[in-house]
């Protein structure tokens, strides 16, 4: 097979290829992508009309100009309705992924990994409270602590809470 340099080609050959393509496509020399270019042209006309309508605001205030020059949100629906009308449908732009807040990320806490430290007095009181009816639990807890928090049960305070973390 012979390799042909593009510069060595006859320019008339390219015209012949264009004419054959026109005959096959049936567009008689009109090489435009009709519906796609029409949609793009409509969008450009809308943007131009938008710019012309707000030109005095843009000229007077720089911040307003920045806001008005931002792309239209959401994009015009005419681009995506072509499939319903029998034309070429353009794919929708991908949706933005939601950014995850670090407040919602689950991390292991101290309470899940280890039990809070409790002194033996409160452990015994909580076990004893389980045997009492719910209406009497507060009163029973106070009585239990009063009776059992004595120097006989806890000589020299050994076993009693010595800092708030043990409660």
UniProtKB/Swiss-Prot annotation:
Function, as annotated, reads:
Post-meiotically transcribed gene that has a role in late spermiogenesis; required for actin cone progression during spermatid individualization.
Q: Which family does it belong to?
A: Belongs to the male-specific scotti family.
Q: What is this protein called?
A: Male-specific protein scotti
Source species of the chain: Drosophila ananassae
Name one process (GO BP) from the record: sperm individualization
Lineage at the top is: Eukaryota, Metazoa, Ecdysozoa, Arthropoda, Hexapoda
Q: Which InterPro entries match?
A: Soti (IPR031397)
- The protein's recorded glycosylation sites are 30, 124, 148
What keywords were assigned to this record? Developmental protein, Differentiation, Glycoprotein, Spermatogenesis
What gene, per UniProt, encodes this protein?
A: soti
Indicate whether Glycosyltransferase appears among the record's keywords.
no
